[in-house]
Amino acid sequence: MKRICSIYKSPRKNEMYLYVLKADGLERVPEGLLPFFGTPVHAFDLVLSPERKLAREDIAKVLENLDSQGYHLQMPPPDDDYIEHLPEELLRRNDPA
């Protein structure tokens, strides 16, 4: 079951991608998703098959979503920037001398 897929990147969120069947284009993408995603920017086209490996997505889930809902939304990886790092002197403040 090979699928020719168009992948679009989000102009609003770095590393967020939208996979759609090339033949369908964006017509099956829900209207409510586009304000969140932004105006899709075409990144590239790709032939997807169960044997193909994807860097950050499960190919079986992508193909299932394409068949059932007409699109797959790849969310960006978790951002670790929200973790605050304490200065070394604060980390050692309660250490025994």
UniProtKB/Swiss-Prot annotation:
Give the superkingdom in one word: Bacteria
Q: Which residues cross the membrane?
A: none
Q: Give the InterPro entries listed for this entry.
A: YcgL-like_sf, YcgL_dom
What PANTHER family does this protein's entry cite?
A: PROTEIN YCGL
Domain YcgL as annotated: residue spans: 3-87
Return the Pfam families for the record.
Answer: YcgL
Alphabetical list of SUPFAM superfamilies matching this protein: YcgL-like
This protein is called: YcgL domain-containing protein PSEEN4034
